[in-house]
Amino acid sequence: MGCRHSRLSSCKPPKKKRQEPEPEQPPRPEPHELGPLNGDTAITVQLCASEEAERHQKDITRILQQHEEEKKKWAQQVEKERELELRDRLDEQQRVLEGKNEEALQVLRASYEQEKEALTHSFREASSTQQETIDRLTSQLEAFQAKMKRVEESILSRNYKKHIQDYGSPSQFWEQELESLHFVIEMKNERIHELDRRLILMETVKEKNLILEEKITTLQQENEDLHVRSRNQVVLSRQLSEDLLLTREALEKEVQLRRQLQQEKEELLYRVLGANASPAFPLAPVTPTEVSFLAT
């Protein structure tokens, strides 16, 4: 404003020096030059006012351009800071998840080793028990065979002596004894085959038990893995929800700060331009589109 007054004062034509009237001469009538002089002064004032308005408009445009540039720089800086913060959070989450996965893996390894030791111990006990059963049955079979052999020998000896005393010829006796021995051998063979079938059945049952134990161990391991994955998914979803809430709160704070900064700039611009001067270009307020853009 001060420049305007100085400009107007500089644009005024210079005043003519007044000459003192001579007392001897009668007063002369003033020339009629007031009208043209006032017209030139009005034109000069209008030109100065238009130049001042043009300069004022340029100042407003420059201030608005500076405001837009500062707003863009501020938005870019906020976006970079937000990206860095999100990247740091993601790195921290990755480190935390890796630590948790490592701990869970160690726990699974420990439980797997314990289960492996328990199953190995139970398998050894079952194998030793079955081996003891097989050895006991084998010894019983051998003892039975030895006993039958002794009984047969004693019976054969007694019958042979008695037959010789009664008949004097051993041929018929040997035929009868051979038939009885053949019958006994057939019975023993059937008994042996029965014991063999039982042993084979026990081996088959043992193999099936081992296969079932392996399947149970595999299913338990898969069940534990599924439980661990579900717990990790729940923890990750909760963490992401918390991060989303924190990001929204930070975004709201940034939007409030931006509005406050914009309001301060508008007040400063209002003070610079004056209370009566209205800017030709209105300031762009914070729109919901910009907020959603920052949120994404």
UniProtKB/Swiss-Prot annotation:
Transmembrane parts of this sequence: none
Protein name: Coiled-coil domain-containing protein 69
UniProt keyword Signal, yes or no: no
Family as reported in the entry's similarity comment: Belongs to the CCDC69 family.
Bias kind Basic and acidic residues: ranges: 19-33
One GO CC term on file: cytoplasm
A GO term for molecular function: microtubule binding
Keywords of this entry: Coiled coil, Cytoplasm, Cytoskeleton, Lipoprotein, Myristate, Phosphoprotein
InterPro entries: MTUS1/CCDC69
Cell location: Cytoplasm, Cytoskeleton, Spindle; Midbody
Compositional bias annotation for Basic residues: 1-18
Lipid attachment points (N-myristoyl glycine): 2
Region (Disordered): 1-41
Domain of life: Eukaryota
Tissue specificity comment: Highly expressed in duodenum, esophagus, pancreas, prostate, salivary gland, thymus and urinary bladder.
Role according to the record: May act as a scaffold to regulate the recruitment and assembly of spindle midzone components. Required for the localization of AURKB and PLK1 to the spindle midzone.
Coiled-coil positions: 48-272
PANTHER family for the chain: COILED-COIL DOMAIN-CONTAINING PROTEIN 69, TOUCAN, ISOFORM A
Chain positions with Phosphoserine modification: 154, 241
Origin organism lineage: Eukaryota, Metazoa, Chordata, Craniata, Vertebrata
Biological process terms in GO annotation: spindle midzone assembly
Endpoints of the signal sequence: none
